[in-house]
């Protein structure tokens, strides 16, 4: 409903590609001519990740999915599956294969392309849930962060000035170990080191903001984290630079009455809603020539 709709949209908990194809054909979205990138993931429930993009602004040059292998908290390995390869597995992230002890969860989607002529990399995430408790399940998200860091480091190895945006539902806050230590994202732009990551959601959390509420406590599981070349403080805007971030929580996305007033408006008791999470966004700036 905005006059300038998002150029790139990362989505989580998508049942299948058909859902996204239907979405971009709805009356409000059809005029914007969005493209769709999606892989089926091993998650049995069909809650995949995907990417929507405005074709006039972003041209994908490559995309792949990176499978997270978790074995009851044991080691993981990264398998990149290119376009056309089959997805593997068929269990959800709280079930364990009795033979292999593997916990099935979502893949991480890497999309590289030209954003208004400039190379940018997007990684869409939906890290393992907190099923079984935050502490007990934390190693699974730490492994997801390790995989994410491996992808990012590989992009930095090719180009130390790589412009990378990693985003999604991390099922952890900006302060959790998975984000701060395993992934290495910091909350102050001036503290971002070379080949580092800046997390604008850290300060939002400190200010009491949130994308998800549980037992009257807000947290920010939904995060957009940018690489140092994007976050670098400079007066040079001849190329894309991070400007600002926010949580999109207009009143129509909120419960408007009752015990959960102000919470995200989710499907409940047969009443349709939008989501139990508020979406987040970032703006990038670039001088027009």
Language model features: what each stretch is:
Residues 118-140:
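Active-site His/acidic residue clusters
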Residues 4-8, 31-34, 116-120, 159-163:
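Loop/turn elements at helix/coil->beta-strand transitions in domains of secreted/extracellular proteins
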């Amino acid at each position: 409903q905005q006059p300038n709709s998002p150029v790139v949209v990362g989505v989580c908990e998508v049942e299948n590609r058909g859902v996204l194809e239907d979405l971009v054909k709805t009356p409000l979205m059809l005029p914007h001519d969005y493209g769709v990138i999606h892989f089926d993931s091993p998650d049995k429930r069909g809650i995949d990740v995907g990417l929507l993009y405005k074709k006039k602004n972003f041209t994908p040059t490559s995309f792949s999915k990176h499978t997270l292998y978790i074995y009851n908290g044991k080691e993981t390995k990264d398998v990149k599956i290119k376009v056309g390869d089959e997805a593997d597995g068929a269990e959800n992230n709280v079930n364990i294969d009795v033979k292999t002890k593997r916990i099935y969860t979502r893949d991480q989607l890497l999309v590289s392309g030209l954003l208004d002529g400039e190379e940018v990399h997007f990684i869409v995430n939906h890290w393992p849930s907190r099923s079984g408790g935050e502490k007990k399940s934390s190693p699974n998200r730490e492994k997801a962060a390790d995989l994410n860091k491996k992808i990012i480091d590989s992009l930095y190895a090719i180009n130390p000035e790589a412009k990378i945006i990693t985003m999604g539902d991390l099922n952890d806050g900006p302060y959790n170990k998975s984000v701060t230590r395993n992934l290495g994202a910091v909350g102050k732009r001036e503290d971002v080191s070379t080949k580092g990551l800046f997390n604008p959601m850290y300060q939002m959390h400190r200010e009491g903001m949130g994308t998800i509420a549980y037992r009257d406590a807000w947290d920010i599981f939904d995060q957009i984290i940018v690489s140092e070349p994007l976050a670098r403080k400079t007066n040079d805007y001849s190329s894309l630079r991070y400007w600002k971030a926010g949580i999109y929580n207009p009143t129509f996305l909120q419960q408007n009455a009752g015990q959960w007033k102000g919470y995200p408006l989710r499907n409940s008791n047969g009443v349709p809603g939008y989501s139990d999470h508020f979406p987040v966004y970032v703006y990038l700036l670039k001088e027009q020539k």
